[in-house]
Amino acid sequence: MDFKDTLLMPKTDFPMRGNLPNREPDIQKKWEEEDIYRLVQERTKDRPKFVLHDGPPYANGDIHMGHALNKILKDFIVRYKSMSGYNAPYVPGWDTHGLPIETALTKNKKVNRKEMSVAEFRKLCEEYAWKQIEGQREQFKRLGVRGDWENPYVTLKPEYEAQQIRVFGEMAKRGYIYKGLKPVNWSPSSESALAEAEIEYQDKRSASIYVAFGVKDGKGVLENGERIIIWTTTPWTIPANLGISVHPDLEYSVIAVGEDRFVVASALVENVASACGFDQYEVTRTVKGKDLENIIAEHPLYGRDSLVMLGEHVTTDAGTGCVHTAPGHGEDDFIIGQKYGLDVLCPVDEKGVMTSEAPGFEGMFYDDANKAITQQLDEKGALVKLEFITHSYPHDWRTKKPTIFRATAQWFASIKDFRSDLLDAIKETKWVPEWGEQRLHNMVRDRGDWCISRQRAWGVPIPVFYAENGEPVITDETIEHVSELFRQHGSNIWFEKEAKDLLPEGFTHPGSPNGTFTKEQDIMDVWFDSGSSHQAVLEERDDLVRPADLYLEGSDQYRGWFNSSLSTAVAVTGKAPYKGVLSHGFALDGEGRKMSKSIGNVVVPAKVMKQLGADILRLWVSSVDYQADVRVSDAILKQVAEVYRKIRNTFRFLHGNLFDFDPKTNAVAVEDLREVDQYMLIKLNKLIDKVKKAYDEYEFAVVYHSIHNFCTIELSSFYLDFAKDIVYIEHADHPDRRSMQTVFYETLLALVKLSAPILPHTADELWSHLTFVEEQSVQLTDMPETITVPNSEATEEKFDRFMALRDDVLKALETARNEKIIGKSLEANLKLYPNKENKELLASIKENLSQLFIVSELTISEENEAPNDAQSFATGKIAVEKAEGEMCERSRVISKDVGANPKYPTLSLRNAEIVEKYYQK
């Protein structure tokens, strides 16, 4: 007979190869047909809620690695929470207004804006946004992200816009919204004001000039004709100069350079002299900054007054300690100008072109005017020094062009009135990483008022009317009416109708005796859109709650969505919209460089999924320290795929050895398991506790390493290795075999559930092959619970010591292999000469030690009986010889009793007995 037929070899239809790129779409199709999201929600509907609120990605273009990282992290949490006692809905969202969509449509002359009305152009923007959402939705679903994809929230949906209007109205009612002339970050290339979050810093080469302002009226402190030196890197703002700021507490020096007398901060005299090339100079006297107040200098180009003012913002970090002040072109300049009653002069238009308020430079683009202004200063003898520097300068994040500070009439949300409430709310929120708290605290503490208006077409209109006398009209009645109009018709109605048709019927206002009104043309900053989601989504949807348990986004969102959401929520509810905030870093290439098409180092999620599958991408996300920037490359993904293979093979081995196991009839009670099997259950319990704790603390790399290590170290290298001599060789119902299978069963169930949030496709694929489970998907189960093992501490301590001894045995076997004494470990006759403690340890182990060590022969003697060539270890001495006897054809174990049963000349007695009893017909 063929003895192979008598072996209980693994049987499984769970394939060895993942073939994920082909298999995952089928699994996802099945999820969709079953409506797995709804099934999970129904199963958990009576549990406490855990709401992770999706920060809406911008609906433009394909998803990149940053999107994948973000969405997968969210999915880990939502999937885990729904398997650990919570009802965890996930409603994905999209941010859909703003300049990138306008630009995408007008680029390459696809759409000619000038040939259509604003309303028509906005319709095209909306169509484009929906198309982008469709593309991104499919890509996000392909990642295996589970959510309410059929009912996402979208910032252009009428019901969303209606709620956004209510948020604006509530803030206006509380006095937080105002219109004012103020310098704002302005992008000439976009012709619009920008929020702080829309600015990025890049290096720029600029003129750096030192300019002298002659003293007109020295107030008895300075003498007429002495000259105050200012320093600036924006010569184009000199025509807007109305003053010079000095610090009240600084000391200022008058220095003589030839015939000239210059005034600079004493602490900067040497720097200025060096920069301006003053080889010889002398300090003639010093004065206190506060004594310079109200001195009048003369504008070097126009001869008008330039007032010396006191400002706390003046520093000695750079420059001269005398700060050129143009209230129309800087935040500090504006504030100090207000204090001293200066005009807000801004001689630059929305395109960045100098106006008639800058005589001599009218019609020039501001950057081109730099040269002309510098030349004129030189001609008038006011230019002390010109050089060029490269410095970090603000740029428009979309057009990548430089921005300027420019005073315009804008709508603002005043932060100062509720700043302390914002800071309190930050304190009450849980931040991961912890430094997030300080980061947002500092931003909120230092930020000015929020400019919420944009001079664009594609966005939510600012719902303000103007009376005949120019007074802005914002009342409960108008807000409610506009909100309702938007809910019914969408915000495009604002651009389709006249003001009178947008107001409540019969509306009157004292500022409009003739009953006529106009409407605001500006739209809201897109950060106001997404920042209103706590009201439009969390508060409005029945399946969600405000505050959310968690907001999770990239670290760029401290100044973006985390900030705008906090501002609007605290303004209208007094509380943060979130209980916790988690931030992640950016995805970089394998060398830690930013991904860019020009370098050719972009890793595209779609390509990774086509080649390796979504589960590999997800496993990569779980493997990285995502709170910092993360690296990804083909080589890194290859390593992750190797780990995946190991985990999958472990699943397959466990499953294959359960083909004849029915837990209802074959499972062994925990107290009846062999000790080594109990030991494995104890190790499994530790894994379960560790992994669940790691999920709870969002430490996914701990989950990844713990599962991987358990599969490779505890299972493959030990338990599953020696198992073969039992589960393949013994008869089906042998107690040792059923004992091991019981542990295989518990281990497989625990592993598939623990890995399900990270590897949902693989987990569900395996689940579909399990005959002993009732639920149709692993997603409809809960995380595994630990199993109580009697005397677990003593058993663990005992077998941990055994494992230390086993490590020494493996080293000794390896040495014997290198010395060609043996090939495989089954060729060994292992001779142990343990020390006293280990001799007692070995005596206490009831299991077959030859099996545990995977050797054919084993003897244990006193330590002092060891031969001279025995290897010494901390546990005792070990010698390895070649086992004597023949190899049993069935078990591959070398035995002296092979052929002892003449009916089976090639089998050992043990194997002959099994065959005769169970397989002989």
Swiss-Prot record:
Q: EC number(s) per UniProt?
A: 6.1.1.5
Which GO biological process entries does UniProt record here?
isoleucyl-tRNA aminoacylation
Compartments annotated for it: namely: Cytoplasm
The EC class name is ligase
Q: Which GO terms describe its molecular function?
A: aminoacyl-tRNA deacylase activity; ATP binding; isoleucine-tRNA ligase activity; tRNA binding
Task: State the reactions this protein catalyses.
Answer: tRNA(Ile) + L-isoleucine + ATP = L-isoleucyl-tRNA(Ile) + AMP + diphosphate
For the ligand (L-isoleucyl-5'-AMP), the binding residues are 553
Taken from the UniProt entry, a GO cellular component term is: cytosol
Detail which positions bind ATP. 597
State one Pfam family annotation: Anticodon_1
Keywords of this entry: Aminoacyl-tRNA synthetase, ATP-binding, Cytoplasm, Ligase, Nucleotide-binding, Protein biosynthesis
Primary localization: cytoplasm
Motif 'HIGH' region in this chain: where? 57-67
Q: Record's PROSITE patterns?
A: AA_TRNA_LIGASE_I (PS00178)
- Describe the function of this protein: Catalyzes the attachment of isoleucine to tRNA(Ile). As IleRS can inadvertently accommodate and process structurally similar amino acids such as valine, to avoid such errors it has two additional distinct tRNA(Ile)-dependent editing activities. One activity is designated as 'pretransfer' editing and involves the hydrolysis of activated Val-AMP. The other activity is designated 'posttransfer' editing and involves deacylation of mischarged Val-tRNA(Ile).
Give the UniProt family note.
Answer: Belongs to the class-I aminoacyl-tRNA synthetase family. IleS type 1 subfamily.
Partners and quaternary state?
Monomer.
**Comment text on domains:** IleRS has two distinct active sites: one for aminoacylation and one for editing. The misactivated valine is translocated from the active site to the editing site, which sterically excludes the correctly activated isoleucine. The single editing site contains two valyl binding pockets, one specific for each substrate (Val-AMP or Val-tRNA(Ile)).
Q: What's the protein name?
A: Isoleucine--tRNA ligase
Provide the species name: Bacillus subtilis (strain 168)
The organism's lineage? Answer: Bacteria, Bacillati, Bacillota, Bacilli, Bacillales
Gene name per UniProt: ileS
